[in-house]
Design a protein with these regions (language model features):
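Hydrophobic alpha-helical transmembrane segments of membrane transport and translocation systems
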Residues: 289, 294-298
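Membrane-embedded alpha-helical bundles of polytopic integral membrane proteins
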Residues: 2-246, 250
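Interfacial loop-to-transmembrane junctions
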Residues: 265-288
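Juxtamembrane boundary at the C-terminal end of a transmembrane helix
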Residues: 297-306
């Protein structure tokens, strides 16, 4: 378990609190500012931005549900571009930007008419395109650069293309809402219980702020949210949520940890600054990307489309 004196140094490297001779005052200050220091954000602004994004998504799903595809496509493009910038600035990686951007959009848009065949076909063509695009720069750094391009391609557009698949059935709006609500419940439960009761670090070398107590909150809130959504939105057996909830929460938390690991490796705090109070859009997409394919699969299995 990390001590209270070490946390301020890790979360805010330039802060003098950790080096203060008055350890009692330093601990009190750290405890008093816990909500903002743990989030590292302007909380009111972050909440306002989050509510605005939620309103746009909700209106689109309740009016013309196909507009969800455009939201996914734009979000994937922004997230992909943020990853490009972070990898290039921090590590000098030369990515296959054009093939990944074009191929990523193809996967998302072709998932609507062609399903998994459209996703797989676009993925294969994009992989070959990445090889050819990077080949023109020579052998130096080829494996590193192509590997990073594959990471971006699979992490963002490939995973998010399954978010498109969620909206395809007639009850697609309810499926997308179920997916989003479970992930939001997971984030909310993890933040709330982690802030209140967090004592045991979950992955101290990856994300020191995450605790097992917070993970328990994510499981609890996510499972309750999943059960309610399955019963009320999808009109099916509520106990399916006992399966869907924990699995989606596990994927969402994994995505969050993966992004934390990438940022630590690159030595950066945020992927970008697109969203006021949040950082980059990838700070919001990380858990959604890794849970979208699993959400689609679980709902197809347990709540088959009509």
């Amino acid at each position: 378990m990390t001590s209270s004196a070490s946390r301020p140094r890790r979360d805010t490297p330039t802060s003098p609190v950790g080096a203060s001779a008055d350890a009692g005052n330093g601990a009190a200050e750290s405890t008093e500012k816990a909500p903002s220091s743990k989030a590292g954000r302007n909380l009111p602004v972050a909440i306002a931005v989050g509510l605005g994004m939620g309103a746009v998504i909700l209106v689109s799903l309740l009016t013309v549900r196909q507009t969800w595809i455009a939201i996914v496509a734009v979000s994937a493009a922004i997230g992909t571009w943020e990853l490009f910038g972070a990898l290039h600035r921090a590590a000098g990686i030369r990515l296959s930007r054009v093939p990944v951007l074009i191929g990523g959009q193809a996967m998302i848009w072709l998932a609507w008419p062609f399903g998994t065949e459209g996703i797989l076909g676009s993925l294969l063509v994009t992989v070959i395109g990445c090889f050819l695009w990077r080949m023109r720069l020579g052998a130096a750094g080829f494996v590193r650069d192509v590997g990073a391009s594959m990471l971006v391609l699979c992490w963002v557009p490939l995973c998010m293309s399954f978010g498109t698949m969620l909206v395809v059935p007639v009850d697609g709006a309810a499926r997308v809402l179920t997916f989003l609500i479970v992930v939001i419940c997971s984030d909310t439960g993890g933040y709330a219980l982690g802030a209140l009761f967090g004592r045991h670090p979950m992955a101290p070398k990856v994300s020191p702020k995450k605790s097992w107590e917070g993970f328990g909150g994510s499981i609890l809130f996510g499972t309750v949210g999943a059960s309610l959504c399955v019963a009320l939105l999808l009109d099916d057996r509520w106990w399916y949520g006992l399966i869907i909830g924990p699995l989606l929460v596990g994927c969402a938390v994994t995505g969050d940890l993966v992004e934390s690991l990438v940022k630590r490796d690159l030595g950066i705090k945020d992927m970008g600054s697109f969203l006021p109070g949040h950082g980059g859009l990838m700070e919001r997409l990380d858990s959604l990307c890794t849970s979208a394919p699993v959400a689609w699969l679980l709902l197809v299995v347990h709540v088959p489309p009509a």
